[in-house]
């Protein structure tokens, strides 16, 4: 069983990361473990920026957005020599367990630390994109969803006033979950996501059909990277003769106090990660095959090998086809 653990946040920040850190710290302390917070993700691990945490270090953190430990992208961590230094920094402090909060790239780093250095690593899915395999939802997804829906509601007010078509670009990388959920909750008329082939002409055809039925304004929700929003807006305006404007929500989607569900999810996952590290889950985990990651499926905490969850065939979360069918029926 581990005696000292580290916790870090890596990659893009997500609301609820602080709640997850809090869950890890307080659960670990209740098991008699020492906990070290690692600043700025793997970058801080490499530069040996660590500090011991107690229960008061995470007081008043459950409601705070962002991550008080800081986060950074550190592609140099792919270099084995860089990882050797990071491992040595942990071993000098006696750290034998590590909780990594982030996306699949962060998971990959954790898995390497386990395989190369014997550190017992557990990953928690922290990303607004909801694109991590092995879990129904990721920490931060529902808070980002509230942010996007609020923006859609505001855009609908002005779009209806001016009989305008509004395009909303939503984060998600190669996963359309956030766009899809926001489109349903925001009552969007049209949607474009990576999981379904997107063609401008098909979208315009749908918009024209809506106009023919008497539709005077519309909201189009589209996942980032599918198209250039400004160019798409000009194309739609030219083809439909309706004023069209694009709005890129950007990094505002990552900020804000986490909603209640994200706080609960993060707390449960943090505590479950500690349970895995202290062998409270039966049967005890065998870290000789690599690190593990935590997920929630049907509202129950689950775990799986990181290598399974980041495998190409499992890398993306399962497309919510039933959600998409519902959205199409309601357009």
Swiss-Prot record:
It is an enzyme of class 2 (transferase). Disulfide bonds: none annotated. Its cofactor is Mg(2+). GO terms for molecular function: 6-phosphofructokinase activity; AMP binding; ATP binding; fructose-6-phosphate binding; identical protein binding; metal ion binding; monosaccharide binding. Allosterically activated by ADP and other diphosphonucleosides, and allosterically inhibited by phosphoenolpyruvate. Homotetramer. This is ATP-dependent 6-phosphofructokinase. The lineage of its organism: Bacteria, Pseudomonadati, Pseudomonadota, Gammaproteobacteria, Enterobacterales. The gene is pfkA.
